[in-house]
Structures are given as structure tokens and as C-alpha cells.
Amino acid sequence: MDNAVDRHVFYISDGTAITAEVLGHAVMSQFPVAINSITLPFVENESRAKAVKEQIDAIFQQTGTRPLVFYSIVIPEIRDIILQSEGFCQDIVQALVAPLQGELKLDPTPIAHRTHGLNPGNLIKYDARIAAIDYTLAHDDGISMRNLDQAQVILLGVSRCGKTPTSLYLAMQFGIRAANYPFIADDMDNLVLPPALKPLQHKLFGLTINPERLAAIREERRENSRYASMRQCRMEVSEVEALYRKNQIPWLNSTNYSVEEIATKILDIMGLNRRMY
């Protein structure tokens, strides 16, 4: 086994396992421990559950350390099989459901796939999210300037500062129609807001990045090029930040933030509603 791995961590569900992963990762991030993550979705029958149990037990036998198991399983028979394993098992949903049951004075009605599955109750939200993703893809990197008025936010920035991944995350996670527009090297001699963006200034949000980080990212894409040179990166970042200040466009330095953090900060600063899917 890998000596750098302190614990093996399983995320198990009879659905997508997204909930188990998200909550499990949040918990594990509180501890200074190296982990080997194993995600097992759609554990929906006894034969698969027994195979998962065997996998957990095998790791225990090999390492002598109990694997950590975060699970979200509503089928009692499946859950019982996992609980018989040699893992340290934590029902991440039940830990919250039990106290709420007393507060609400209601019994839960657990259904597999309810959180991330497609069902009549969430079809409208699902369709809205797909529409947001389609819109965002069609308006990535300035591909199209049509229907920009339908965007909820328009991200600006130099090439490789994080516009595309942030736009896609906003669309996929929150159902936000996010367009993005790049400022390229040819724009820098006379950098101004494009005419199509001026009437939509209330939707504009700028991204910037430290020149050193930008140069490193670009170097991976175009090695030893003017595009990746420190001089070029410093100049572009300086010009774009000056444009943001001149036009009073809210902006964020993305250097030390994850895509998730950037997107959340944009939602907060722009006053956009968070719609979780």
C-alpha cells in the first residue's frame, strides 16, 4: 500500500454519492491526514453491497487500519450489509435527519436518488439548469455576442485567468446563465469596453490573476512564447485592472481561490440567488 496514505475513505450511496462525497470531503478537510478516496455510487442491491463490504474488509486486512466510510443509503438491507464491514461507518444524512425529526415532529420519507435524481418534483429546475449550461457554452470566450442581455453575469478577463471554468461551474452548480469575454493581446494597445458590453455594465464582473501565476499557466499551454512571457502577462494584467477601475467594474483576483470559491464570491458580490441542484 502507499505509505503516504494515512486512511482510506469510502463514499458510498444507493444514489449518485455526490452528497456523501461533498459532506465527507468537508469533514475530512478538518483533519491533517492524507487520504485515498474511493467513491462507490448506486449500491442498490445486496450483491453489490456485499462486494463493497468485501472491498472495505480487504483494505482493513491489508493495512490493519479501519477504512472510514461515509454513506448515504436509504435501503435498510443494503445499509445493514455495509454496517457489518470492518469500516468506521458514518451515516452522514441520518446525523442531521434524526434531530430534525424531533424538531419538525415529522417522520422522514427516505427515497433513493431524491437529492440528485430526476423526478417530477425537480423537472423545472433540471430544465433551467440545462438551459443555463447551453447558454454558457454558447457564450464562452466571446464566441457569441448575441443575446447577452439574457446573461445573469458576464465575466471579463485576460486569457487563462479562470473565466471558462468559473462560468461553467456557475451554470452547472447554480443554474446561472454566465457569459464570458476575453481581453487578448491585440486589445491592449487601446483597451476599452466593447460597445456590446457597455449597456450591460451592471452584469459585468472582472477576474484578474497574479502575473507570475498567469505566466506559469500559459507556459504549460504555449512554452517559451510571447504569450507566456512575464512581460506580456504583467502588461495585460495591469491594463485590464486599470479598465476595471476606470469603469467601476467589480473584480476579484482569482490566484489563491478555487473555482468553487470564485463562483461563490461572484454570487455574493453580484447579488445573484444561489440555486442548488
From Swiss-Prot:
Binding site for ADP: G157, V158, S159, R160, C161, G162, K163, T164
Top-level EC class: transferase
InterPro entries hit by this protein: Kinase-pyrophosphorylase, PSRP
Keywords: Kinase, Nucleotide-binding, Serine/threonine-protein kinase, Transferase
Statement: the UniProt record of this protein carries the keyword Kinase: yes
Swiss-Prot/TrEMBL catalytic activity: [pyruvate, water dikinase] + ADP = [pyruvate, water dikinase]-phosphate + AMP + H(+); [pyruvate, water dikinase]-phosphate + phosphate + H(+) = [pyruvate, water dikinase] + diphosphate
Pfam family, one: Kinase-PPPase
The EC number(s) this enzyme carries: 2.7.11.33, 2.7.4.28
Molecular function (Gene Ontology), one example: phosphotransferase activity, phosphate group as acceptor
Summary of the function given for this chain in its UniProt record: Bifunctional serine/threonine kinase and phosphorylase involved in the regulation of the phosphoenolpyruvate synthase (PEPS) by catalyzing its phosphorylation/dephosphorylation.
HAMAP family noted in UniProt: PSRP
Family the UniProt entry places it in: Belongs to the pyruvate, phosphate/water dikinase regulatory protein family. PSRP subfamily.
Protein name: Putative phosphoenolpyruvate synthase regulatory protein
Organism: Enterobacter sp. (strain 638)
